[in-house]
């Protein structure tokens, strides 16, 4: 089973450029998770009859959003934190809106695992959303995963908007206090790993400096001055089923590239 995740930075743009369909035809994913779709169902005309589509779009037009395209039938689907977890967290509107209404979470149940697709809030250049990340979103996500894991193993993927360690970005020293590499954001990923979830790429590529996102500025992609902020994590119990984990830098059309894993059941 081939699972892919890709922050497409606007699905309509990818469809217009042809890069999205080129990717689908080349890789034929069994399950595809998208982030930053920036569209509601029907706004992006995707002609993929072999896939069932699940959309979680932001209330704000042209912003955020996630989607799952699956050839595999789901047992259940939801797009919110469990009520108990949601009620325990101090979700508040800010200048960007309410993070619960931004289409950032999808939970699809399959026969052998739960798949969680996330577009984690960016802390913003002024770090105005760092407190949301550290105190609300990251703890709620771990709680949600551990609750689901009581029933089935977890696959979680998406854009986490944070590089975990110094080998996960080209210029760690100059980004120590910048959004995406603050100690709080890095600790959030450490907490996820400490909760028992495995960074699949590092299982196969423990020392490789490869990236999934590049700034639009200063020819960053051409010079490979990037960040690894897109991940697949899995429950430890799925490790024997994990056959590969890859980054696909050759696919263009977004400031991110796709990442993938292969599971064999």
Regions found by a protein language model. Give the residues of each.
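Active-site-proximal loop/helix segment associated with metal-binding centers of metalloenzymes
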Residues: 114-131, 171-185
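Active-site beta-strand termini and strand-to-loop segments that position acidic
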Residues: 71, 108-111, 235-236, 261-265
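N-terminal, active-site-proximal structural segment of metallo-dependent hydrolase catalytic domains
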Residues: 1-48, 52-54, 58-66
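Short Gly/Pro-enriched turn/cap motifs at secondary-structure boundaries
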Residues: 56-59, 96-98, 221-224, 249-252
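Structured beta-strand-rich core segments of catalytic domains in phosphoester-bond hydrolases
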Residues: 38, 44-125
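Active-site beta-strand/loop signature of hydrolases that rely on acidic residues for catalysis
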Residues: 6-7, 24-42, 115, 144-166, ...
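Conserved beta strand-loop-helix elements of the APE1-like EEP
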Residues: 61-77, 220-240
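Metal-dependent phosphoesterases centered on the DNase I-like endonuclease/exonuclease/phosphatase
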Residues: 52, 137-225, 229
């Amino acid at each position: 089973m081939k699972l892919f995740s890709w922050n497409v930075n606007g699905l309509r743009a990818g469809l217009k450029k042809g890069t999205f369909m080129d990717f689908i035809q080349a890789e034929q994913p069994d399950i595809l998770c998208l982030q930053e779709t920036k569209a509601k169902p029907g706004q992006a005309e995707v002609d993929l009859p072999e896939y069932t589509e699940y959309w979680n779009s932001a209330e704000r037009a042209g912003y955020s959003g996630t989607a799952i395209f699956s050839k595999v039938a789901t047992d259940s689907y939801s797009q919110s934190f469990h009520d108990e977890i949601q009620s325990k967290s101090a979700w508040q509107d800010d200048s960007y809106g309410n993070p619960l209404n931004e289409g950032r979470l999808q939970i699809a149940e399959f026969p052998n695992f739960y798949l969680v697709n996330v577009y984690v809030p960016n802390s913003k250049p002024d770090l105005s959303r760092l407190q949301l990340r550290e105190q609300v979103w990251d703890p709620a996500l771990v709680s949600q995963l551990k609750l689901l894991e009581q029933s089935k193993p977890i696959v979680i993927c998406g854009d986490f908007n944070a590089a975990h360690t110094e080998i996960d970005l080209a210029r760690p020293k100059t980004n120590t206090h910048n959004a995406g590499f603050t100690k709080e954001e890095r600790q959030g990923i450490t907490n996820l790993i400490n909760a028992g979830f495995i960074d699949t790429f590092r299982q196969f590529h423990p020392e490789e400096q490869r990236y999934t996102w590049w700034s639009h500025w200063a020819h960053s992609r051409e010079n490979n001055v990037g960040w690894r902020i897109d991940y697949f994590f899995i429950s430890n119990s799925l490790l024997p089923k994990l056959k590969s984990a890859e980054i696909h830098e050759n696919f263009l059309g977004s400031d991110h590239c796709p990442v993938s894993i292969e599971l064999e059941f």
